[in-house]
Amino acid sequence: MAHKKAGGSTRNGRDSESKRLGVKRFGGESVLAGNIIVRQRGTKFHAGVNVGVGRDHTLFALTDGKVKFEVKGPNNRKFISIEG
């Protein structure tokens, strides 16, 4: 005869692995062509001059230069471009 009542099971206890999103190179930093500037879900930041967009909306440098963040347009969108 059991002296302790059996405990029920829980349906919790899982968590997904973090995706390491965010800005990888900040304004004024030097980058080489191919360097990842931002990893993001959707287009929180938009691609400006000399910046490419990956399939998962990752922004990366197309040329060597310095990273520049700017807010432009009627909707105040954040653009990232590479200067010089």
Curated annotation (Swiss-Prot):
The lineage of its organism: Bacteria, Pseudomonadati, Pseudomonadota, Gammaproteobacteria, Alteromonadales. Belongs to the bacterial ribosomal protein bL27 family. GO terms for biological process: translation. Keywords: Ribonucleoprotein, Ribosomal protein. This is Large ribosomal subunit protein bL27. The keyword 4Fe-4S does not apply. GO terms for cellular component: cytosolic large ribosomal subunit. One of its GO terms (molecular function) is structural constituent of ribosome. Residues 1-22 are annotated as: Disordered. InterPro entries: Ribosomal_bL27, Ribosomal_bL27_CS. It comes from Shewanella woodyi (strain ATCC 51908 / MS32).
